[in-house]
Amino acid sequence: MAKVLVLYYSMYGHIETMARAVAEGASKVDGAEVVVKRVPETMSPQLFEKAGGKTQTAPVATPQELANYDAIIFGTPTRFGNMSGQMRTFLDQTGGLWASGALYGKLASVFSSTGTGGGQEQTITSTWTTLAHHGMVIVPIGYAAQELFDVSQVRGGTPYGATTIAGGDGSRQPSQEELSIARYQGEYVAGLAVKLNG
């Protein structure tokens, strides 16, 4: 049984929705055990509420437990072309895992969201840098998801990983096409994890 973790940070719920779709896709793979968790919030409850943050029910992960999984699919909103501060803070606590090589050879993939589309690819590839330092095997999705060829509407999605465009005010929710790409990413990564570890 290959263990797959979908690990995310979501303030307004866009990445949470994408994470559910990623997990749904991963769960289609026989031999994959899929877990969804989120990183801890670093804002105070008062500031989080004032900023309009969405309460979420996924359990909170600890950095040390990452070593228990064969594949980790990370989800983060874009903050100036980088991962969110909450995800950065979480990954900055993985020094012990790095020192012991605990994540070496494990699969890693990334999905993201942006307000207007700017930075979606940069966020994924800049997150890869941290994962590469851990010796993780980075898994992009390429152009296998047919929705990536559809230019008839505004949508996220890159060969690097699934993305969604939330709109400048955050009112746009992930489209069916974006969720389909996210499901593909989950299924693809879980399938590889089973082949390598199942």
Swiss-Prot record:
GO cellular component: membrane
Binding site for FMN: 10-15, 78-80, 113-118, 133
SUPFAM superfamilies in UniProt: Flavoproteins (SSF52218)
UniProt remark on cofactor binding: Binds 1 FMN per monomer.
PROSITE patterns on file: FLAVODOXIN_LIKE
Keyword tags: Flavoprotein, FMN, NAD, NADP, Nucleotide-binding, Oxidoreductase
Binding annotation for NAD(+): Y12
Reactions catalysed, as given in the entry: a quinone + NADH + H(+) = a quinol + NAD(+); a quinone + NADPH + H(+) = a quinol + NADP(+)
EC numbers, comma separated: 1.6.5.2
Flavodoxin-like domain: residues covered: 4-189
Cofactor dependence: FMN
InterPro entries assigned to the protein according to its UniProt record, in alphabetical order: Flavodoxin/NO_synth, Flavoprotein-like_sf, Flavoprotein_WrbA-like, FMN_Rdtase-like_dom, NQO
Enzyme class label: oxidoreductase
GO molecular function: flavin adenine dinucleotide binding; FMN binding; NAD binding; NADH:ubiquinone reductase (non-electrogenic) activity; NADP binding; NADPH dehydrogenase (quinone) activity
Pfam families the record matches: FMN_red (PF03358)
Sites where the protein binds substrate: W98
UniProt family annotation: Belongs to the WrbA family.
Protein name in the entry: NAD(P)H dehydrogenase (quinone)
Taxonomic lineage from the root: Bacteria, Pseudomonadati, Pseudomonadota, Gammaproteobacteria, Enterobacterales
